[in-house]
């Protein structure tokens, strides 16, 4: 899907499933994972009936663009971040089992920020022992061009909070070459991805011609940015490169590399993990029916061509939504 098509689809295709998650006891969480195959429908932890937000009407070219995004965006709302973390771990572990069995590899894309804290349950029982970590291949949706041991490094954040606690083979964790310039690091990372597509580690989307990662675990900034794709920045319109670079990030540090929207939108699964009242305004705009293509936030441009998009949120993050 081109970026322009993604913009049109984001502004016209607004069917959502809103599911409120009560705080289930640990015994119930464990029970939901037994005797139930992985489902691409509502997540097994949805313990109350889902409601549907009305979809906007579509017409003409906008409807044609939206046709590339027929999958609903499911919005899961948790009473507490702890319950969100439990459900996110289960979601990821089930995808790992399903897709590793199908493909022989499981490609996971991480973001920085609070996402690493949100996936902490994967490094605890039962997942620490039950997940086949040897099949995992880990990438970053964006990275700051700083040394790997720098406090701003997304690699360091993930290493300290997650990767050092699980037995993923070192050679299957793909950090950037921090000795290169931003442009050089972006080109080098894209070259790495193309080689992994050639080797069959990363799938290729037959519909878009871009790499198809198994799952992206993403966060969102208070301004609605995802990856290092910021509101109003020209990079949101990049539609040829897989990985590009930015030297004038509005959020420090200024030099970064980032996946482009065609890569993000070719994913098989995306979990958008957003917590806290500070992001409620962006969540409200992203999930509102009242949109125009001229004022989309980057998070609204994440429209999967042929995949499943799930929001993992807590009550403060959706506090400005009317139908929460």
From Swiss-Prot:
GO terms for molecular function: 6-phosphogluconolactonase activity. It is found in: Plastid, Chloroplast. Residues 19-43 are annotated as: Disordered. It holds the Pfam family Glucosamine_iso. One of its GO terms (cellular component) is cytosol. One of its GO terms (biological process) is carbohydrate metabolic process. The keyword Chloroplast applies. Keywords: Chloroplast, Hydrolase, Plastid, Transit peptide. It catalyses: 6-phospho-D-glucono-1,5-lactone + H2O = 6-phospho-D-gluconate + H(+). Pathway: Carbohydrate degradation; pentose phosphate pathway; D-ribulose 5-phosphate from D-glucose 6-phosphate (oxidative stage): step 2/3. Its EC number is 3.1.1.31. CDD domains: 6PGL. Residues 1-63 form a transit peptide. Belongs to the glucosamine/galactosamine-6-phosphate isomerase family. 6-phosphogluconolactonase subfamily. Hydrolysis of 6-phosphogluconolactone to 6-phosphogluconate. This is Probable 6-phosphogluconolactonase 4, chloroplastic. The lineage of its organism: Eukaryota, Viridiplantae, Streptophyta, Embryophyta, Tracheophyta.
């Amino acid at each position: 899907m081109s970026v322009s098509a993604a913009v049109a689809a984001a502004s016209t295709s607004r069917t959502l499933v809103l599911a409120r998650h009560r705080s289930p006891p640990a015994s119930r969480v464990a029970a939901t994972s037994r005797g139930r195959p992985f489902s691409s429908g509502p997540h097994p932890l949805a313990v109350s009936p889902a409601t549907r937000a009305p979809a906007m009407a579509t017409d003409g070219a906008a409807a044609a663009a939206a046709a590339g995004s027929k999958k609903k965006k499911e919005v899961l709302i948790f009473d507490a971040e702890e319950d969100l973390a439990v459900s996110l771990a289960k979601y990821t572990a089930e995808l790992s089992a399903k897709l590793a069995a199908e493909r022989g590899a499981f490609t996971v894309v991480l973001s920085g920020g609070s996402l690493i804290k949100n996936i902490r349950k994967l490094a605890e029982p039962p997942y620490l022992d039950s997940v086949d970590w040897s099949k995992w291949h880990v990438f970053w949706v964006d990275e700051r061009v700083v040394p790997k041991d720098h406090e701003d490094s997304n690699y360091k954040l993930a290493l300290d909070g997650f990767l050092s606690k699980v037995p993923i083979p070192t050679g299957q964790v793909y950090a950037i070459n921090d000795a290169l310039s931003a442009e050089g690091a972006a080109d080098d990372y894209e070259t790495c991805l193309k080689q992994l597509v050639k080797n069959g580690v990363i799938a290729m989307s037959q519909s878009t011609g871009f790499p198809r990662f198994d799952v992206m675990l993403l966060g969102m900034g208070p301004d609605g940015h995802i990856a290092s794709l910021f509101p109003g920045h020209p990079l949101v319109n990049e539609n040829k490169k897989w990985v590009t670079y930015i030297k004038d990030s509005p959020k420090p540090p200024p030099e970064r590399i980032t996946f482009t929207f065609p890569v993000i939108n070719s994913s098989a699964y995306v979990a958008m993990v957003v917590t806290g009242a500070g992001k409620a305004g962006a969540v409200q705009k992203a999930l509102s029916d009242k949109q125009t293509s001229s004022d989309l936030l980057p998070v609204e441009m994440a429209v999967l061509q042929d995949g499943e998009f799930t929001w993992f949120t807590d009550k403060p993050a959706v506090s400005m939504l009317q139908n929460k």
